[in-house]
Amino acid sequence: LRYPKGLLFEDFPTTYRLLLKANKVVFNGEQSYFYRLRSNSIERKAFSLQKLDSGLKLLEMIDRQKNILLPIIKSYNCRTVSFLFHLLFQMPKGYVYRKVFQEKIRKLRWSVLLDERARKKTRIACLISFMGFELVEKIFCKMKSINV
């Protein structure tokens, strides 16, 4: 099992496969894993063709491995929708792939909304998306600017 070379966000589709191969996985309530946020990190960089290309390739990988992820498909759908919103919020208005990402969110949002263990922020974004993706983006950008 290897992380794909040259892709951004490469841990997303691979970590789930790694967890499924483990004999035992332990969860605890402690926050023991931290991302180091650097000023030049992927998270802080503006939207680019490399981000889009990586995002599209990762979505292809996700679609190909859904059959092995059935035991955890709800959490995987939630993570996928979070990832799609993350990239969607960074895309320029009118960008051709916005519709592709929005359609993928539409296909998965009921799964996320009906999953009581799904991330609250993602469930809220899915709910608001029924009123339009522009509204979701406006609300979440406002929340981000006031650090909510």
Walk through the language-model features, giving the residues of each.
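Conserved nucleotide-sugar donor-binding catalytic segment
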Residues: L1-S48
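Charge-rich, low-complexity amphipathic helices
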Residues: L18-L19, N40-R44, G55, L84, ...
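Active-site catalytic microenvironments for nucleophilic, acid-base chemistry
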Residues: K21, L87-Q90
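Catalytic core of nucleotide-sugar-dependent glycosyltransferases
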Residues: E30-S39, R44-L70, Y95-V112
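Structural motif
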Residues: I68-C78, E116-R123
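Amphipathic alpha-helical repeat scaffolds of TPR domains
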Residues: S75-L87
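Membrane-interface aromatic/basic loop that binds lipid-linked glycans or pyrophosphate carriers
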Residues: K93-V148
